[in-house]
Amino acid sequence: MAGPRPVVLSGPSGAGKSTLLKKLFQEHSSIFGFSVSHTTRNPRPGEEDGKDYYFVTREMMQRDIAAGDFIEHAEFSGNLYGTSKEAVRAVQAMNRICVLDVDLQGVRSIKKTDLCPIYIFVQPPSLDVLEQRLRLRNTETEESLAKRLAAARTDMESSKEPGLFDLVIINDDLDKAYATLKQALSEEIKKAQGTGHA
């Protein structure tokens, strides 16, 4: 595909992916485009349909997955999450670098497609730090917190697999982590800027 490559960002919940992405989008709002994921979970307070997620029924999502309309999907805590081909195409149609925020299962699914993105894993300095960050959010029950930490431990182990990620960023200092992320994407940012973006 011509133009800048998409970016796949992965990492455990609480590693700081959303914060890093927010900074990236603030600095380069005309260059990056978020691929909006689908989910069958209920919206959290303040979340908007079509902006944070496409909130859909399980029946609708299962039908579209069966039809091959998703490049990746996964189930977590009883809810389906996934990225549709259409969501990625919508970003590419605007000539932007498409950002996909997916879990490890999603990364493996995307590896089987012809998307050819840059794969980046964001991880916390330790599981203890991750637990503190998740507790500060105050959105988890003890049970869901334990599940997230177990998943994070597995993800952090898997991120060491050779060839799975192009870059692993340890987010112990937000500014440093952001500088590393920007450096990794500098070539693609230049490409996107060269296509008439400010």
From Swiss-Prot:
Top-level class of the enzyme under EC nomenclature: transferase
Active site: 44, 137, 148
Recorded catalytic activity of this chain's protein: GMP + ATP = GDP + ADP
UniProt key word Membrane: no
PROSITE patterns to which the protein is assigned, alphabetical: GUANYLATE_KINASE_1, GUANYLATE_KINASE_2
Top-level taxonomic group: Eukaryota
One of the GO BP terms on file: dGDP biosynthetic process
TM segment ranges: none
Tissue: Widely expressed. In retina is expressed in inner segment, outer nuclear layer, outer plexiform layer, inner plexiform layer, and ganglion cell layer (at protein level).
Chain ranges of the Guanylate kinase-like domain: 4-186
Function of the protein: Catalyzes the phosphorylation of GMP to GDP. Essential enzyme for recycling GMP and indirectly, cyclic GMP (cGMP). Involved in the cGMP metabolism in photoreceptors.
Designated name of the protein: Guanylate kinase
Taxonomic placement: Eukaryota, Metazoa, Chordata, Craniata, Vertebrata
